[in-house]
Design a protein with these regions (language model features):
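Sec/Tat signal peptide C-region and signal peptidase I cleavage site
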Residues: 16-21
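Short N-terminal segments immediately surrounding and downstream of signal-peptide cleavage
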Residues: 22-41
């Protein structure tokens, strides 16, 4: 188990008007207008061209205050420049980080032995039912999410998203039934549709036996949308409860309420608003987040502390919400099951009369693998798609899609060797690659929403 040396994150986390330790950045666009105030209609100070170097001294909303030639200052939007990757983490890199977030109360954050949750911990961690009950107890309904939006003047906006999956639906469970891990209705259905997927997963290594197992499972064990929904709802608490067994919820009731209200509002703008969405902040200084099947989303305290606004919180949650909407980790579990059990176990568990699979699949899966699936790297396209979805969800939620870019910039400034980013870097594309993809894609139909406060 790797233990990192003492890392001092000493920052003055600032309200408007104070100054950041400067962060180097480079102009990304052919031309960028520098404004006198953080408004698009503010007077123009100058125009910068691609490759020009600037120093960021502060962030206000989704604008950076920058220093340009001869000591002049002005404002550019967060996607006009690209923060330079810090070469290595240390006191200097951390001081330079854009920490104007939740911890921006004039306090100094000192983290000793920063160590992210690793795969072995998640595999071995026991389900913490008390913590799981607490997370579920913090859950709010769609009406509470809408009330949050009304308080802040946010209005739902219709924004098309062709890549969004219309997931399987399921009735929202009661608090009592949701608090207890539930068995899947048809565990074998987990294997049922994998014949067409096995080749891409195992390639030539699978061999004829594995392919036959997949084909047989696909023919013998049908799977309906209702079965998929039941399996996701059963797996979610089992996996989230084990993440909470590795790291408990952060003891900050207001922060937990905040992420649930924001998260529920954003989730209501997706194609799966009826999932029993539950959000939580776990007490670990790392910068990461997790999405378990069935609408369970956990954010590490280290990431939450970076976020300076509700829109930045929504950006992080939106990325994870997309993984739930698209069933990304559920699909990983399906592949693991097929690769692990194969033809013999699949057929052994099939009832010849009904074609269903006996046993508590969700618990059996969790007992074998724990919550290690949370640190399984998804296909890069799935991560890029979740970034795009987060921008869509921000726009639909009445917020500014640029908030995601601001979050990625903050993480970028932590450095390529950041201990706090170690696990995230193992499971996600490089941060600069993610921003490159956003830049190439552009905002197109989302452009009008990038002018929002």
């Amino acid at each position: 188990m790797r233990v990192y040396p003492l890392i001092l994150i000493a920052t003055t986390l600032l309200a408007w008007g104070a100054a950041f330790a400067q962060v180097s950045a480079v102009v990304q666009k052919p031309t960028v207008e520098v404004h006198a105030q953080p408004r698009l209609d503010a007077p123009k100070v100058t125009t910068l061209t691609r490759g020009a170097s600037v120093s960021i001294s502060a962030q206000q909303g989704l604008w950076y205050q920058v220093q340009i030639a001869a000591g002049a200052t002005g404002f550019v939007r967060v996607n006009d420049v690209r923060v330079s990757y810090a070469g290595a983490e240390g006191e200097e890199a951390n001081v330079r980080a854009l920490f104007d977030g939740k911890s921006g109360e004039g306090r100094v954050t000192e983290t000793a032995g920063v160590r992210g949750i690793d795969e072995s911990e998640l595999k071995l961690a026991a389900l913490d039912q008390t913590q799981l009950n607490a997370m579920i107890g913090n859950r709010v309904d769609a009406a509470a999410g809408a009330a949050y939006a009304a308080e802040r003047g946010l209005q739902a906006t219709s924004v098309a998203y062709a890549a969004e999956t219309k997931g399987a639906s399921a009735a929202e469970p009661t608090e009592a039934t949701a608090a207890k891990p539930r068995p899947a209705k048809s565990a074998g259905a987990l294997l049922g549709s994998l014949g067409r997927e096995l080749g891409s997963m195992l390639g030539d290594k699978a061999g004829p036996t594995a392919t036959t197992a997949a084909d047989t499972a696909a023919k013998v064990i049908p799977k309906s949308d209702a079965e998929v929904a039941a399996e996701e709802l059963a797996l979610g608490p089992e996996i989230a409860g084990r993440v909470l067994g590795a790291r408990p919820l952060w003891n900050d009731a207001e922060a937990q309420r905040r992420v649930n209200r924001i998260g529920r509002w954003v989730a209501s703008q997706t194609s799966r608003p009826d999932l029993p969405w539950a959000f939580g902040i776990i007490d670990t200084p790392e910068v990461n987040a997790y999405a378990a099947p069935g609408g369970f989303v956990l954010v590490a305290r280290g990431l939450y502390d970076l976020l300076s606004s509700d829109s930045e919180v929504a950006a992080v949650l939106g990325h994870e919400i997309s993984h739930c909407v698209q069933s990304d980790h559920y699909n990983v579990i399906r592949k693991q099951e097929l690769a692990s059990y194969g033809k013999e176990l699949a057929l052994k568990d099939v009832d010849a009369t009904t074609g269903s699979v006996a046993g508590d699949h969700a618990r059996r899966y969790a007992e074998q693998y724990g919550a290690a699936v949370m640190l399984t790297a998804l296909d890069r396209e799935a991560e890029y798609r979740s970034d795009e979805a987060a921008e869509i969800y921000l726009a639909r939620s009445g917020m500014n899609p640029l908030a995601l870019y601001a979050v990625l910039q903050k993480m970028m400034s932590l450095g390529v060797e950041s201990a706090s980013l170690a696990q995230l870097q193992k499971t996600h594309p490089p941060l600069d690659s993610r921003m490159d993809r956003i830049d190439r894609r552009g905002y197109a139909a989302l452009e009008p929403y990038t002018a929002r406060d």
